[in-house]
Amino acid sequence: MKEQNILDIQTRNEFRTWLETHHTTEKACWVCVKRGRPTDDDTFWYIDAVEEALCFGWIDSRQKPIDGVLMQCFTPRKRNSPWSELNKERARRLEKLGRMTDAGRRVLPPMGARSFRIDEDVEAALKAARAWTKFKTFPLLYQRIRAYNVAFYKKRDAQMYQQALAHLIEETKKGKMFGDWNDYGRLLDY
């Protein structure tokens, strides 16, 4: 099957311009983005692409090589699709920065900080392992993102859930936060 809308986009602004024109009429697009810690060069970064997609009610989905180049697919977000805590925080930041559009706002879930509750099984496991007190000393954003990410697997993949939970407990007991939970600092002070 030939993929549609393989875009030759080099910058965040070019992607935003494409989304402004096509977000209501197209079903998908593919772009080449670089992963990793963004720098101030002219590289089109994955995080930038995700942020622009969120502004228009779109979301990243699968990656695959097309003509020998690894491409990222973006699609309109499906109604009632789950929102990760990371994407919720990105949306809060984009709203505050004035980048969010009405199309993006229409698909937002409840956004209050109190709309998130740590999964009771994740909380119980942290408490049983004597890691809960340490976990509660970490930033609230970290707590929400890590607890959500572990709970995400609970109904989808029991083995992955157990591995993610064990890793969270192990790192928490060491007093270590892990992973890119704040988009390389973008989500800390905005």
Where in the sequence are the language-model features?
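Charge-dense, helix-prone N-terminal extensions
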Residues: 1-190
